[in-house]
Design a protein with these regions (language model features):
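Nucleotide donor/acceptor-binding cores
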Residues: 2, 126, 153-155
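Active-site-lining helix/loop region of Rossmann-like oxidoreductase modules
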Residues: 153-245
Length: 245
C-alpha cells in the first residue's frame, strides 16, 4: 500500500480520499480551510455511493501542506483551476525528486507552471503529470457524502519530462489500476480539456443569474445562442490543436 496526498477537499478530493482509504492506502487530505473538514470530522469518515459503495474511515485531515505532502509517494492536485498557480509555487518548494504529482484535472499549462516554479527555485523537480479531466465523475450530495457516477476508463495523462510517462502510469497503477493511458504530451492533454469551453461561456453570459443564485445553476444556463458561443470556442480549440499537429 502507498501514501497518497490529495490537495483539495471538494467533491473530487473527497471522492479520491474515500476510495483510496477503502482500498487500504494511507491517505492525507489537505485543504486551506478547516471548515472543509467539519462534516468528515463530525461523521467520522466519508460515505461513498454509486460506482464505489462504502463508508471510508476518516483520513488524515490537515491544513498544513508540509504535513500533507512530506513522505507521500503520490500527490494529487484536485483543487480548482484558479488555485493551480498558487499551489505550483508552494509545491515547488516542498516536493522532492522521488515524488509524483498529478494535476487531476489540469488546465492547459498546469504541469508547465509547476516545472517553471521548480526552475525559479533552482530545485530539482519531481515527476509532474496532468490529465484533461477528472478520473471521477462525482458530486457532493450532502456533508461528507459523495456520489460517484462513474470512474472513467482510458483517461489520457502526460508528464514532464515526456519520457517519464510510462513510469508515471506504472506508479499510479496501484492506486487507480490501468485507468490512465499515455496522452502523448502535455500540450495535447491540455488542449483536450474542455472545461473552459463548456463552463465559462454560460457563466459569463448569465452573470446576473449567477450573481443572484445561492448555488451555480450550471446546467440550466445554456440557451441556443450560448450553445453557439460554446461551439465557436470549441471549433477554435480544435483548429489550434490541428494546426499544432
Amino acid at each position: 500500500m502507498g501514501i497518497i496526498a490529495i490537495v483539495g477537499a471538494g467533491n473530487v478530493g473527497q471522492a479520491i480520499a474515500g476510495h483510496m482509504t477503502l482500498l487500504g492506502h494511507e491517505v492525507r487530505l489537505y485543504s486551506r480551510w478547516e471548515r472543509d473538514f467539519e462534516a468528515i470530522t463530525s461523521t467520522g469518515g466519508i460515505e461513498l455511493s454509486g460506482d464505489v459503495e462504502g463508508r471510508a474511515a476518516k483520513p488524515l485531515l490537515t491544513t498544513d501542506l508540509v504535513t500533507a505532502v512530506r513522505g507521500a509517494d503520490t500527490i494529487i492536485v484536485a483543487a480548482p483551476a484558479f488555485a493551480h498557480a498558487y499551489f505550483s509555487e508552494q509545491l515547488a518548494a516542498l516536493l522532492e525528486p522521488g515524488q509524483l504529482v498529478v494535476f487531476q484535472p489540469g488546465v492547459l499549462g498546469s504541469s508547465l507552471e509547476l516545472a517553471r516554479h521548480f526552475a525559479l527555485a533552482q530545485r530539482r523537480p519531481c515527476l509532474i503529470a496532468e490529465t484533461a479531466t477528472s478520473l471521477y465523475t462525482c458530486r457532493l450530495r450532502g456533508p461528507a457524502k459523495v456520489f460517484i457516477g462513474a470512474i472513467k476508463q482510458a483517461v489520457p495523462l502526460a508528464t514532464i519530462p515526456h519520457a517519464a510517462c510510462q513510469e508515471a502510469l506504472a506508479r499510479l497503477s496501484p492506486y487507480f489500476g490501468n485507468r490512465y493511458v499515455d496522452g502523448t504530451d502535455t500540450l495535447s492533454v491540455g488542449l483536450g480539456n474542455c472545461n473552459a469551453i463548456y463552463h465559462v461561456p454560460p457563466a459569463v453570459l448569465n452573470i446576473k443569474t449567477v450573481e443572484d443564485s445561492a448555488k451555480l445553476p450550471q446546467h440550466t444556463l445554456v440557451t441556443p445562442r450560448i450553445a453557439e458561443v460554446i461551439n465557436a470556442l470549441d471549433e477554435e480549440r480544435l483548429s489550434l490543436a490541428e494546426a499544432l499537429g
